[in-house]
């Protein structure tokens, strides 16, 4: 039986291919901020057992990191969303005390972090850059850690 958080994960993952988020068209100085959901991360007692359960019962194509869902954005570009169970003792979500963390796909992460800081948003740590994209972290109004990702989707192909 799924708990409410697991129902949320399944619902969001089912919606990704149907209604991918397109950039916010608003009065902010940046044309786009969040362009989609980059990942859904949650704590579990046994990440391997969670991956096995989702593979067996829901057909997730899991690997060491979880499951990657591929979809296309408005322009037809390949995009990915990562689903990943983490060990319940992970420190990765800190300073948040929650059992989950959302990752949002963004454009121009460096500029976005500057803008968010100017708007009074708490920035957690320094931006990091890898061959699969740039990452930054913020806290929302409830103290939830949010991961921002400027992806290089081609690195996963």
Model-derived features: where do they sit?
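Short hydrophobic targeting helices and cationic amphipathic motifs
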Residues: 6-8, 13-15
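A cross-taxon signal for low-complexity, glycine/charged-rich
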Residues: 6, 20-24, 29
């Amino acid at each position: 039986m799924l708990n409410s958080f697991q129902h949320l994960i399944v619902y969001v993952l089912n919606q990704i291919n149907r209604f991918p988020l397109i950039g916010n068209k608003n009065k902010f100085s940046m044309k786009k901020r969040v362009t989609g959901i980059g990942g859904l991360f949650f704590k579990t007692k046994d990440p391997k057992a969670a991956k096995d359960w989702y593979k067996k019962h829901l057909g997730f194509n899991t690997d060491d990191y979880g499951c990657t869902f591929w979809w296309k954005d408005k322009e037809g570009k390949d995009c990915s969303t990562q689903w990943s169970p983490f060990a319940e003792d992970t420190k990765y979500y800190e300073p948040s005390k929650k059992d989950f963390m959302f990752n949002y796909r963004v454009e121009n992460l460096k500029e976005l972090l500057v803008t968010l800081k100017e708007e009074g948003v708490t920035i957690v740590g320094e931006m990091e850059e890898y061959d699969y994209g740039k990452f930054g972290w913020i806290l929302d109004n409830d103290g939830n850690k949010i991961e921002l990702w400027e992806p290089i989707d081609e690195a996963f192909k």
